[in-house]
Amino acid sequence: MQKYIKEARSLLALGIPVIIAQFSQTAMGVVDTVMAGAVNATEMSAVAVGTSIWLPTILLGQGILMALTPIVAQLNGSGQRKHIANRTQQGFWLATFLSIMVIAILYNSRFIIEAQHDIEPELAEKAIGFIHAIMWGAPGCLYYQVLRSQCEGLSKTKPGMIIGFIGLLINIPVNYAFIYGKFGAPQLGGIGCGVATASVFWAMFLMMRYYVRRAPTQRDVMPKKRLVLPEFHTIKRITLLGLPVGLALFFEVTLFAVVALLVSPLGVTAVASHQIALNFSSLMFMFPLSLGIAATIRVGYNLGQRSTEQARTSAITALAVGLMLASCTAIFSIIFREKIALMYNDNIEVVTLASHLMLFAALYQLSDSVQVIGSGVLRGYKDTRSIFFITFIAYWVIGLPSGYLLGRTDYIVEAMGPAGFWIGFILGLTASAIMMGTRIWWIQRQSDEVVLLRSER
């Protein structure tokens, strides 16, 4: 029992700074929406539409680069720190290629937005302007992710927390300047949010670069040469390891976007209630997500130490701590569901329906916790391909179809509206949690030689 308590302390020491870093990142999006909304509804809608295209695209890139975390953790644990600089440099090359891809997609976002024939021309133009502004922050965002993955792989999660929080603080005045044309900046409205956020991503990268170059704990992993040529076999290895994670994130974000579209014909009350439950769940999601990142670090490090038993302890502890935290957040969601809904909206119909949906959101948190921490454990074992297949099946084969059948049709029961989609979420995430748990159990039953060989990929 003592070893699990000790491991829980290590996981929380890594996970708490990540929670704050993730909160800062999420809050930047909230700040953009709120500050644009203070101008008028069109500006806020433009930011919302633009973000719905920007977010899945950049998350795909970030997910691929997250593969660096278990790679660095394994090298750190196995005493091969001298190879970390090379992996980080190749990570920068990969981030450069991904940035070009992201910018190319976002530059042509006009075709995606204008394909929606019922969108107002002014809203479309402002959304495109926002995307064309924020896309120049993609390289800064992805370069920052490379250095953050290096730090997290070395069990240094506090730099990401501090720099993420500073980025949030910078974002507010820079937003204000570009939205309203203050301090000599042009008045851009919602487009100014894109300019501000892109600028903040570059500032965060430069701050993280300064930390990495100056920190005593990072000196021995600094590259000997400033510039090295791309090693395509190394870049390929990172990509093959990270692509399933990136696609899993992409599938998750696009699933919620599709569900929002499917709920929209049900009326304003249904859409607002669904959005309240989803937004609050997203805030609670930071806890298991952060523990999942901590689990990746601990499992990867222990496998580098060639201790499959300790890696197993890390995995079990992370899942147990995650379930306990999810139980607490679920109980909190149930008890205070009406007060939470009132924080978002004071319309009695919206609050009533949102309070009802929060009951489903509470159950959702339990299975979501297991599946997201399970994903982190599998990343630590470098078993990322299974994450892709599990996520695709759980979200798009089980979750979305069952949600649609329950929410919009009367084939099984009378159409349940938004509640049907939330039951679909629960079914999909529960299936994902079971499949993740089964996969972890299968890996841990294999011989130490097989597990360690996989971890050295």
Curated annotation (Swiss-Prot):
It is found in: Cell inner membrane. One of its GO terms (biological process) is sodium ion transport. Keywords: Antiport, Cell inner membrane, Cell membrane, Ion transport, Membrane, Sodium, Sodium transport, Transmembrane, Transmembrane helix, Transport. The chain crosses the membrane at residues 11-31, 53-73, 93-113, 127-147, 160-180, 188-208, 243-263, 276-296, 316-336, 357-377, 387-407, 416-436. GO terms for molecular function: antiporter activity; xenobiotic transmembrane transporter activity. GO terms for cellular component: plasma membrane. Belongs to the multi antimicrobial extrusion (MATE) (TC 2.A.66.1) family. MdtK subfamily. PANTHER family: FMN_FAD EXPORTER YEEO-RELATED (PTHR43298:SF2), MULTIDRUG RESISTANCE PROTEIN NORM-RELATED (PTHR43298). NCBIfam families: matE. Multidrug efflux pump that functions probably as a Na(+)/drug antiporter. This is Multidrug resistance protein MdtK. It comes from Proteus mirabilis (strain HI4320).
